[in-house]
Amino acid sequence: GSVDLIYSSLAIQWCQNLPQFFAECQRVLKPGGCLQISTLVPGTLTELNSAWALVDDAVHVNAFDELGVVKAAAKSAGLKVSSLVDVPHVVSYLKLKDLMADLKGIGAHNMNQGRSQGLLGKSKYQKLIASYEAYRVDDRLPATYQVLYGSFNNG
C-alpha cells in the first residue's frame, strides 16, 4: 500500500459491499496505516421510522449495518480494530418538514427493498406529521443519528 491515512465521514453507509470497501482500504494502506470512519448504525432516525410505521407498512428509513457487521468486515479484510464506539447525536426541529428538507438537502434517499415507489400524498404526509408529534419535547421534534466512530490499523 501507499497511503498513510484514509478518512471516511458518513459515506460507507451507502456502500453496497462493505467487505469490499474494507478490503480496498487494507490494500491501499501502508503497513501501520490508519483508517478512520464514521458511519450510521441502527438507532438512526428511530423516531421517523416509528412514526412511519403508524402510517403504512412500507420501508421508509434505510436499514444500517450493525456495529458487529462493520467490525467483522474490517477484521476479515485484515484490519485491526483500534476503537469502535457508537454515539447518539440528536438534532431537533420545529417542524417535520424541516427534518425532511435536511434529509433531502444532504442527498439521503431510501435504498431499501420494499420502499414505496409512489409520491407521498397529502393525506399520508398529514398522518406522518401527527404520528411524529408524539416525540415532541420542549417544543422541538428530535431526530436521532446513531453514529459509529471507528479506527482501524493495517497490520
Q: Where are the regions a protein language model picked out?
A:
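A short acidic, Gly/Pro-enriched loop at the edge of an enzyme's catalytic core
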Residues: G1-I6
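Short catalytic micro-motifs in class I SAM-dependent methyltransferases
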Residues: L10-Q13
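A glycine-rich, hydrophobic loop/mini-helix early in the fold
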Residues: Q16
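Amphipathic, non-transmembrane alpha-helical secondary structure
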Residues: P19-A23, L54, K97
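A short glycine-rich, Lys/Arg-flanked "PGG" loop and its adjoining helix->strand segment in the class I
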Residues: P19-C34
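Conserved catalytic/acceptor-binding region of the Class I
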Residues: G32-L96, I106-Q117
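Conserved Class I S-adenosyl-L-methionine
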Residues: K80-G155
